[in-house]
Amino acid sequence: LAPSWLAGPLSTAIDLLAAVPSIVVGLWGLLVLTPVFRTDVEPFLKKIPGFEWFFHGPVYGPSILLASVVLAVMTLPTVVALSRTALSGVELADREAAMALGATRWQVVRKVVLPGARSGIRAALTLAVGRALGESIAVAMVIGNRPAIPHSLSAPGATLGSAIVNQFAEATPGLGTSSVIALAAVLLVLTVLVNAGGRALLGDRATGRATFIGAQV
């Protein structure tokens, strides 16, 4: 979709991002993004009309919002790589047929390429969610690790992975250790189910192959 002069460098940069260790991304979020979110981003969002439902209470810096941004950066290579494969897998004959019928470039993208790659893009998003569920180190560094249900995106919180990382070493023998193991079991089941769903969508991608209908253009 992007021009060739931009697609190459951009793809390379995103592929290199996948090789960055999660702890490095976590340190970047902790040392670079946390001060920016505390002093600029979250106070600005609280001033936008209608956003007060999502950003209320004191601003801490480490928060659900910051952890979401860090996770988005970490899962971006997965989404881009699989989506790129799905988009390139759309039959060239379908694209040429659409253009032969007078479709513009963006009509071909909207009516042929995106419908043909829809299941692959869904699979990419599903697998990215699976990776986000299992991420723990980077999230634990930026989410604040408060064991309570947050009522604001600017408030600290905890995920299953971050709770396991922070509590396992200090869990009391017996009930404490059992609770952490139960969290790990729940996380394992969720991750397996989400990744299985993504793999199933990838397997069914061929059935979603688009056919161009001139009347729709």
Walk through the language-model features, giving the residues of each:
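Membrane-interfacial helix termini and adjacent extracytoplasmic/periplasmic loops
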Residues: L27-V73, G144
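Short coil/turn motifs that cap or connect alpha-helices
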Residues: S4, T104-R105
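Cytosolic-side transmembrane-helix boundaries in multi-pass membrane proteins
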Residues: L190, V194-V217
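Hydrophobic transmembrane alpha-helical segments of multi-pass transport and channel proteins
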Residues: A19-V20, I121, A128-A132, L160, ...
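Cytoplasmic-entry segments and transmembrane alpha-helices of multi-pass inner-membrane transporters
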Residues: L1-G29, R95, G208-V217
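Interhelical loop and adjacent transmembrane-helix boundary motif
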Residues: V139-L188
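Transmembrane alpha-helices
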Residues: L16-V20, V24-V25, V79-R84, V90-E91, ...
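Hydrophobic transmembrane alpha-helices
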Residues: A13-V20, L33, V69-V79, V129-L133, ...
